[in-house]
Structure formats: C-alpha cells, structure tokens
C-alpha cells in the first residue's frame, strides 16, 4: 500500500455500481497522485485504477508518505486542499446527476475532458482516446444514450467524431447546453 504518482499517462478510477456496472469516478493524468485518501483514512482503496494510455507510475511506500506528512507542512496543506477539492467535485457530481438532464451532463463531461486533458494542437480533438461506454460511465447513463446524444451533437455541428477521437467544434454551444454560463 502506498501513494501512486503518475509521471506520464492517463488512468481512470472506477467503482462497480448497481449490478456490477462500472462508474468512472475520476480521471487522472500526468502529475496526479492516487491513493492518498485510503492512506489517510487507513481503509482499503475502494476504486479500481486502470491505465487507459501508456503510463509511467511510481509508488511511494506508506511509511515514507506518513513521514513526509509529519515533517512537511506544505505537503500536508496540499493534501488537505486535494481532499477538499475532491469533496467539492463529488458534491457537484451528486447535484448534477440528481438535477441535470443527460444531455446537459454529457455536454459538461465533454467540456471537462477538454479542460482536463486539453486538445491536439492541429485539430482541437480531445487529447484522450475514450470509448462511448467510458463517457457513459462518467455521465451516469447508458452507452446507447451517449451514442444517440453524441450523434445529435455531431449533427448540430458541436462536435466531430472519428472512432474514439472527439473533436470539439463549438465550445460555446456546449457551454450553453451544459448551462455553465454565469
């Protein structure tokens, strides 16, 4: 048991939900750390981490992590901020799933992927290869629903699809659709 540091790559964290359906709870990338919540709480980590692109990951043993926390107040403050940010994200996700229609959640998820992973310089495609099923697991809906709604977004000219690659064409329209304008 220890703290996992993603040097390079992309990882999805998921949990089995109702009837074993995968729910993606977090996406991680370069410089992210995983496992700190379980280390701090002393409980087993309840999520499964799956590498979705080639990655280099290092492990900091539990004892070393505890020692660093005890002697480095900046690290301790940083971990506390990460925990607070994760709690806020979880609260926002609960509210979204409870109150937003699926299309709004999908638009927001696509924008989140764009913000988090960025886009390719040459064509504004998301800098992540992701399946429709994985998007459905982020949004909290059926894969078939995501396929249909993404087809609708493509027809409306907001996105372009090329296999597992997604190009954001009209970010402003997605922002409006997701009700993210102030």
Regions found by a protein language model. Name each.
Residues 11-23:
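A short beta-strand-loop-beta hairpin characteristic of the jelly-roll/cupin
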Residues 1-3, 21-23, 44-45, 123:
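A short beta-loop-beta micro-motif enriched in histidine and acidic residues
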Residues 26-88:
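Cyclic-nucleotide recognition modules
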Residues 52, 70-140:
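Polybasic "coupling" helices that flank or enter modular domains
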Residues 113-182:
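Phosphate-/nucleic-acid-contacting segments
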Residues 10, 54-56, 134, 165:
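Structural motif
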Residues 1-14, 30-31:
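Glycine- and acidic-residue-biased ligand/ion/polar-headgroup-sensing regions
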